[in-house]
Amino acid sequence: MKYQGSPGFSHGQADKIGVLVTNLGTPEAPTKKALKPYLKEFLSDPRVVEVPRLLWFLILNGVILRFRPKRSAEAYKTVWTDRGSPLLFHTQDQASAIEAKLKQTWGDNIVVDFAMRYGNPALSEVVEKMMQKGVRKLLVLPLYPQYSASTTASTFDALAKDFTKRRWLPELRFITHYHDFSPFIEAAAQRIEKHWDAHGRADKLLFSYHGIPLRYLKNGDPYHCECYKTSRLLAERLGLGKDEYLTTFQSRFGREEWLQPYTDMTMKALPGKGVKSVQVFCPGFSSDCLETVEEIGEENREYFMESGGERYEYISALNAESGHIDALSQLIENNLQGWSVEDVTEQRQQRADQVKKQSLPYDD
């Protein structure tokens, strides 16, 4: 096997610290053609769908990829903007803002970039770009506040797979979760309070998280517990009583039982229980995306209003708001402790260039 080297490296050059923020991914366009390879990559991940591989291969390629790309493309069209996919540009904005924040302390010694677990920008390509810039210490932050094997661990799998192809590996640190990180809770609470200041409160506040199969919880995945802890900490910070908020789970897929209560079923039931107004916030989504803008902002609105509800409001994700960037930057700084880089003088760089030149074979 031929391992990938670092041809741009020169002895004595400045080592840099890299911060790689990642998210799930997005198709290249809201079209059936673009959705098929994206969904195939996503749904082929054994961390996402824990089903015997041969059986799932037949289901995925024989059924799902024949019909789902068209339906998904129609949904993506409703959230697509001039800048493209919301998840893509929000993550890009977050990375840019984090970089600006960190450079106040680290200057040019730090490199910040972003990648997607599925689709583009591909994780392996971004890691290579960062290595070529001199990154020798790499901190990875998957933007999933609550850990799950289907998201956070999958990101680590992809990173580890990339490392198997490299000759020179960077020092690595990997943030697995931040569901109870106080600055994150504060940023989320302030986002909700900002909405309340503009629109007032509803009868009920729902914290809706992406669901996972119940089987994953029973097999030891801590995601369910971390979601409930985030909800509890937010409720305490906001001064909410137990009857003023709910934790629900959305986006279930297939016939298997997932974490409950389901967001959509809750929306259909609440008006019959006397709840006429609701506000929904999604603490597990660092950026607005299809699941928040379309599924929560539109689809679940219809369920609630058609069931007798009178007022429904989606509270947007934290995206690149300053409080969120401050929280993520502090989280990163906490995890960079103990790492340092050495500034390279002009004289040292000239010496390094000379050494590199002497080490290269002579031209004929």
UniProtKB/Swiss-Prot annotation:
- Give GO MF terms, alphabetically: ferrochelatase activity; metal ion binding
Q: Which GO terms describe its cellular component?
A: cytoplasm
What Gene3D superfamilies does UniProt report for this protein, alphabetically? 3.40.50.1400
Record-listed Fe cation binding positions: H210, E291
Quote the SUPFAM superfamilies the UniProt record gives: Chelatase
As its record notes, the protein acts as a catalyst of: heme b + 2 H(+) = protoporphyrin IX + Fe(2+)
E.C. code: 4.98.1.1
This protein's pathway reads: Porphyrin-containing compound metabolism; protoheme biosynthesis; protoheme from protoporphyrin-IX: step 1/1
**Keywords, in A-Z order:** Cytoplasm, Heme biosynthesis, Iron, Lyase, Metal-binding, Porphyrin biosynthesis
What is an annotated GO biological process for this record, any one?
heme biosynthetic process
Q: Which PANTHER family match?
A: FERROCHELATASE (PTHR11108), FERROCHELATASE, MITOCHONDRIAL (PTHR11108:SF1)
The UniProt function text for this chain reads: Catalyzes the ferrous insertion into protoporphyrin IX.
Q: Which NCBIfam families match?
A: hemH
Quote the protein name from its UniProt record.
Ferrochelatase
Q: Which organism is it from?
A: Idiomarina loihiensis (strain ATCC BAA-735 / DSM 15497 / L2-TR)
Q: What is the lineage of its organism?
A: Bacteria, Pseudomonadati, Pseudomonadota, Gammaproteobacteria, Alteromonadales
**What gene makes this protein?**
hemH
